[in-house]
C-alpha cells in the first residue's frame, strides 16, 4: 500500500507563490496525492519520495536577481516530468540555458492565449482565457524547447521539451480565472505523468494508521482536544490506530463555545469509547491572560499554557511521549515558511515552547479543511459533528478583541450560540463555510426603551470558501441577518449594536485576530 501511494505522488516545489497550495489542492481534487515542499529539497530526498511528476510553483522573485530562489538543476535529469508555473517556468528556462529579463510592463489579470491543441493543451480550445501575474518574461528558449502557446503580449505563454518531458506555462492554471486551468493540470498529471488518480480518504487512513503505529510503537500519545473538528478527527484517527495507548486531554480553558465541554465528553468519551480527561483550567488561563490585549501575545500565552498543562498531565499519566495536534496545511502556510511572510502565528504552529518535552504527531497537516471533513466521515464520525463550525485552538480568546474578561466571553458565547441557532433554523449550515461572532473592543451609544445605553457592538462574520485559503463574505438574506441582530440585542446583556463583516480574504483573514 505504501509503495503504491508513493508512486502516485506529485511533488510541488514552493518558490513563494500565494497560489502554491492551490496547486496542491487542485491536484488532489483529481484523486492524485500531492505534497508541497521547500525549493531547497535535495535531489536525494526527491529520489526517495519517488514522485510521478514535479511542479515548480510561481513566486515573487526575479530569476536574475542575486539571492533569488533556485533549485538543483539535476531535477531536470531525473527522468520525471517537470512543469514550471510562472517563476517556475522562468527558472527552468534560465537553468537550462535560456534567457529571462524584465518585461516592459507587468502583466497581471486575465489574458487570452492561443495554444497548440496537443501536449498540455490536448482536447482544449485553441483560444482560452488564463490568469497572468508576472513582471519578467522569457526572451530566448533553451535548446530543445518549443512554443505551444502565446498571447499578444507574451510570446512564450507556454513551452515544452517533449523529449525530456519538461513543460512551462507563464500563467496560473491553478487559479479559477484560468478557464481551462484544471484541464491543463489534468493533462499534465494524467496524460504526461501517467497518474491513475486513485488517492482517496480510505487509503489515506490506511497509510496514516501505519505511520502512526510505526512511529509510536508501544508508547503512549496525548491528544489535545479543543472541541473543534480538526482535533476531534485527529483523536478518532489515532484512536483507530493505537486504541488505549491514546489519552485525550480536553482542556476546558474557559474560552469554549456554549455547551462545548459537555458535548465533547458525551460524543467522544461515551460515543467512541475514548479515554478523555477533562481539565478545568479556567482560572489558570484567565489569570495568565489578565491585562493582555495584543493578539499575538494572547495566542502565545494560550499555546504555551496548553503545552505546560500537558506536561503536568503527562507526569501524572507517565510514559506519554507524543502530543497529537489537529494542524492543517493552511495553518502551516499562514504561519510563514522560508518563502512566505508570517500572516499570524498559528496556535498549532507558532505557540509551542522550545522546551516542550513531547514529540509531535500531526496526521492531518497535509490536508485542507474540506479533506479533514471527508476524513471524519470516512472514520465514522456523525455528519453533524464533522460539519460543526471550525473552532480555533485559542477559542473565544481570539474572538474577544483586546483584553479578555468573563463578561466579554459571555457576550461572545451567547451571541455565537444565537447565530448558530438561526443559521441552523434557516438550513444554511452547508451553504456557509464558517460563521461566528466577535466582540470588538468598542462601545457605542444606543437607546433601549426610554433609556440611553452605552454598550458593546457584536460583529457577525460569515464566509463562503472551498479550502480556507481564500474566502468571500456570505450573501445572507437580510431578513436572516435581521433575525440574528434582533435576537442578539434582545437576548444578550450589554449589547446594543450588531454589525456584519463584508470583507473577503484577502485582504482580511477569516478570524479577526
From Swiss-Prot:
It catalyses: XMP + L-glutamine + ATP + H2O = GMP + L-glutamate + AMP + diphosphate + 2 H(+). The keyword Nucleotide-binding applies. The active site is at residues 86, 172, 174. ATP binds at residues 226-232. Signal peptide: none annotated. One of its GO terms (cellular component) is cytosol. InterPro entries: Class_I_gatase-like, GATASE, GMP_synth_C, GMP_synth_GATase, GMP_synthase, GMPS_ATP_PPase_dom, NAD/GMP_synthase, Rossmann-like_a/b/a_fold. It holds the Pfam family GATase. Its EC number is 6.3.5.2. Keywords: ATP-binding, Glutamine amidotransferase, GMP biosynthesis, Ligase, Nucleotide-binding, Purine biosynthesis. Gene3D superfamilies: 3.30.300.10, 3.40.50.880, HUPs. PANTHER family: GMP SYNTHASE [GLUTAMINE-HYDROLYZING], GMP SYNTHASE-RELATED. Catalyzes the synthesis of GMP from XMP. Homodimer. HAMAP family: GMP_synthase. This is GMP synthase [glutamine-hydrolyzing]. The gene is guaA.
Amino acid at each position: 500500500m505504501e509503495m503504491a501511494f508513493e508512486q502516485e505522488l506529485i511533488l510541488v516545489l514552493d518558490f513563494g507563490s500565494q497560489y502554491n497550495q492551490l496547486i496542491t489542492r487542485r491536484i488532489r481534487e483529481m484523486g492524485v496525492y500531492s505534497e508541497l515542499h521547500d525549493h531547497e529539497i535535495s535531489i536525494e530526498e526527491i529520489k526517495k519520495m519517488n514522485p510521478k511528476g514535479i511542479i515548480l510553483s510561481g513566486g515573487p522573485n526575479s530569476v536574475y536577481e542575486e539571492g533569488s530562489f533556485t533549485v538543483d538543476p539535476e531535477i531536470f535529469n531525473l527522468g520525471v516530468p517537470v512543469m514550471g508555473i510562472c517563476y517556475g517556468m522562468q527558472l527552468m528556462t534560465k537553468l537550462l540555458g535560456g534567457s529571462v529579463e524584465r518585461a516592459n510592463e507587468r502583466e497581471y489579470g486575465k489574458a487570452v492565449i492561443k495554444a497548440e491543441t496537443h501536449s498540455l493543451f490536448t482536447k482544449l480550445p485553441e483560444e482560452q482565457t488564463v490568469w497572468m501575474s508576472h513582471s519578467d518574461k522569457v526572451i530566448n528558449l533553451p535548446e530543445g524547447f518549443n512554443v505551444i502557446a502565446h498571447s499578444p503580449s507574451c510570446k512564450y505563454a507556454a513551452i515544452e521539451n517533449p523529449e525530456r518531458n519538461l513543460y512551462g506555462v507563464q500563467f496560473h492554471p491553478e487559479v479559477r480565472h484560468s478557464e481551462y486551468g484544471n484541464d491543463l493540470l489534468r493533462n499534465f498529471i494524467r496524460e504526461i505523468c501517467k497518474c491513475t488518480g486513485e488517492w482517496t480518504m480510505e487509503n489515506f487512513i490506511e497509510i496514516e494508521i501505519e505511520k502512526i503505529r510505526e512511529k509510536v510503537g508501544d508508547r503512549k500519545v496525548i491528544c489535545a482536544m479543543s472541541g473543534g473538528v480538526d482535533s476531534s478527527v485527529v483523536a478518532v484517527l489515532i484512536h483507530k490506530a493505537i486504541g488505549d495507548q491514546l489519552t485525550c486531554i480536553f482542556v476546558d480553558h474557559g474560552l469554549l463555545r456554549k455547551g462545548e465541554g459537555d458535548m465533547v465528553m458525551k460524543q467522544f468519551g461515551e460515543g467512541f469509547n475514548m479515554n478523555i480527561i477533562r481539565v478545568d483550567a479556567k482560572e489558570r488561563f484567565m489569570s495568565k491572560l489578565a491585562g493582555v490585549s495584543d493578539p499575538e501575545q494572547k495566542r502565545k500565552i494560550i499555546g504555551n499554557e496548553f503545552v505546560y498543562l500537558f506536561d503536568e498531565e503527562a507526569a501524572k499519566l507517565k510514559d506519554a511521549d507524543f502530543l497529537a495536534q489537529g494542524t492543517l496545511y493552511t495553518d502551516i502556510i499562514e504561519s510563514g515558511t522560508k518563502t512566505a511572510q508570517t500572516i499570524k502565528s498559528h496556535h498549532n504552529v507558532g505557540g509551542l515552547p522550545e522546551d516542550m518535552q513531547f514529540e509531535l504527531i500531526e496526521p492531518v497537516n497535509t490536508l485542507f479543511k474540506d479533506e479533514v471533513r471527508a476524513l471524519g466521515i470516512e472514520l465514522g464520525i456523525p455528519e453533524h459533528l464533522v460539519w460543526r463550525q471550525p473552532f480555533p485552538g485559542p477559542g473565544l480568546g481570539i474572538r474577544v478583541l483586546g483584553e479578555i474578561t468573563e463578561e466579554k466571553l459571555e457576550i461572545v458565547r451567547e451571541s455565537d450560540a444565537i447565530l448558530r441557532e438561526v443559521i441552523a433554523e434557516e438550513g444554511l449550515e452547508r451553504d456557509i463555510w464558517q460563521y461566528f461572532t466577535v466582540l470588538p473592543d468598542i462601545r457605542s451609544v444606543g437607546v433601549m426603551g426610554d433609556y440611553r445605553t452605552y454598550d458593546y457592538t457584536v460583529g457577525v462574520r460569515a464566509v463562503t470558501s472551498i479550502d480556507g485559503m481564500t474566502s468571500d463574505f456570505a450573501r445572507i438574506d437580510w431578513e436572516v441577518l435581521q433575525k440574528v441582530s434582533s435576537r442578539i440585542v434582545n437576548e444578550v446583556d450589554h449589547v446594543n449594536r450588531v454589525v456584519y463583516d463584508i470583507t473577503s480574504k484577502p485582504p482580511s483573514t477569516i478570524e479577526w485576530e
